[in-house]
Amino acid sequence: AVFSAAAAGIWQLNSTPVQALKPLELDPSVVAAFSSSPQAVAIQAIPSSEPEPSSQEPLPEEASSEPAQSASGQSESAQTPGALEEQPRVTSAYFDDAVFIGDSITTGIKLYDVMSNTTVLASTGIGLENILSKPAIKYGEETLTAMQALAKTGARKVYIMLGANSILGDHDTMVGLYGNLIDEVRRNAPDSIIYVQSVLPINEEIFHVKYNPNTDNSDIMDFNTKLAALAAEKQVYYLDVGSVFRDETGGMPADYTPDGMHINSAQYIMWFDYLKTHAIAAE
């Protein structure tokens, strides 16, 4: 997936405009892997066919505090696994012990400093077919697979977003690979709450010109439907993050994306705002 940081306003969490990003020409050979751990903040360059976003000046972040809970003291078991409904809002501190696993879309969490207290294990070009086998994560002095790195984090929440790079593949095969990934996440982070995030919609008009005229949002919706069913089967939580980015046509608005697929910096704030209202309060 090609990530480009287009001109977009960067917004604080209170929606006050503070800065506009300038379009950048990106180096297609760079693969980024990040962690908030002092031992694991690095950029790794490995061959890749797609660029990733360049880092910009950090976005102001909401002050971290203790997670909010409902008056009833909502616990991890209060919501049935599967599609997660809106929950009492948590604060930024909820993500202190969270890990985000994904591809170039996920790398933007660190590159734009949207949630600096969280850990990101992501690489441009990573997909369901190689996430378990490809050593693409620079962790300390080591280059590890995502699962090897995950095992070192002590994560209590794990967020996964994968599938965009192979949406035209056989969806049943992709879901099978996703199931294997969930099993491995559970094995390497046994005490974690696992969240499976939907594949984001595309802006078809832009995407068809830049990438592939054969991909449309119906393909993405079909995959997400199967992904939600898998989450229920595996007893993990499904988050329809894509709902934040769908307009009345079911696609992504043109002003949300520089290339029809990736999102601008302001949309990362929208993403985390959704996550804060769709979270299970850990016991």
Can you name each region flagged by the protein language model?
Residues L132-I137, A164-T173, V185, K210-N217, ...:
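Second-shell loop/turn segments in exported
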Residues M161, N165, R186-S218:
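Active-site segments of SGNH/GDSL-like serine hydrolases
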Residues A1-D97, T106, L111:
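N-terminal secretory targeting modules
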Residues Y178-I182, N224:
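Generic structural signal for well-ordered alpha-helices
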Residues P88-L177:
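Conserved SGNH/GDSL esterase-like catalytic core that processes O-acyl groups on lipids
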